[in-house]
Regions:
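Nudix hydrolase/Nudix homology domain
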Residues: 2-15, 52, 80, 91, ...
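Conserved Nudix-box catalytic region and its N-terminal flanking loop in Nudix hydrolases
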Residues: 12, 49, 56-101, 118
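Acidic, metal-coordinating catalytic segment for phosphate/diphosphate chemistry
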Residues: 20-58, 63
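Short, well-ordered beta-strand micro-motif
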Residues: 33-35, 61, 135-137, 156-158
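Active-site-adjacent beta-strand/loop module that shapes the phosphate/pyrophosphate-binding cleft
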Residues: 35-38, 123-142
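A short coil-to-beta-strand element that immediately follows conserved catalytic motifs
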Residues: 110-117
């Protein structure tokens, strides 16, 4: 039994899905309206964003006591953000294959060692958004052509300064923050050497 299961009520009945309708569709996203009836009789319509239910990967490349991140334009907040290597899993790819491909496309590196940290949902109340997080080590140069509109800028952050990075208000990507905290928690030996 997981730690979280102690806090969840196994007897609690999930809401009944009464209807699902497409409210809008773009090239990348679909907005659905989902009519729900809860066990107490209350009915609500929720909206959810469905990016074709494609899962994604996020990769944390570590080399010589540094984490290699990327500076990339984020259209949501309309600014450049420091984030991790990431991208969608293509049809027929495993999460590991996608992580290896994204690493080569975005920062021109291949990893001899790729370790899964865990999978996270970015916003489960409103979308599928499953993200598989990996640590990449034993890196070497290996470039693949990607689909980015402009070159991503690799940024090396000393692991010894990760606490300062996580505490910096300018780092606003929740998935990146979660991945960095997972890295600290699951691989503490990387920080002892830093």
């Amino acid at each position: 039994m997981s730690f979280l299961e102690h806090f969840l009520d196994k007897e609690q009945q999930k809401p009944e899905v009464l209807a699902v309708r497409q409210a809008a569709k773009t090239r990348i996203f679909e907005v659905q309206e989902v009519d729900l009836r809860f066990a107490n009789g209350a009915e609500r319509t929720y909206e959810r964003l469905t990016p074709s239910r494609k899962p994604a990967v996020m990769v944390l490349p570590v080399e010589n006591g540094e984490l290699i991140m990327v500076r990339e334009y984020a259209v949501g907040p309309e600014r450049y953000e420091l984030t991790c290597v990431k991208g969608l899993i293509d049809a027929g790819e495993t999460p590991e294959q996608a992580a290896r491909r994204e690493l080569q496309e975005e920062i021109g590196l291949a990893a001899a060692t790729l370790t899964p940290l865990r999978a996270l949902y970015s916003s489960p109340s409103h979308m599928f958004g499953l993200m598989h997080v990996f640590i990449a080590e034993d890196l070497r140069a290996s470039k693949l052509e990607g689909d980015e509109p402009e070159p991503l800028v690799p940024v090396r952050v000393p692991l010894a300064q990760l606490d300062a990075l996580v505490g910096d208000e300018a780092l606003g990507n929740s998935q990146t923050l979660a991945a960095l905290m997972l890295l600290q928690r699951k691989r503490p030996e990387l920080f002892q050497a830093a």
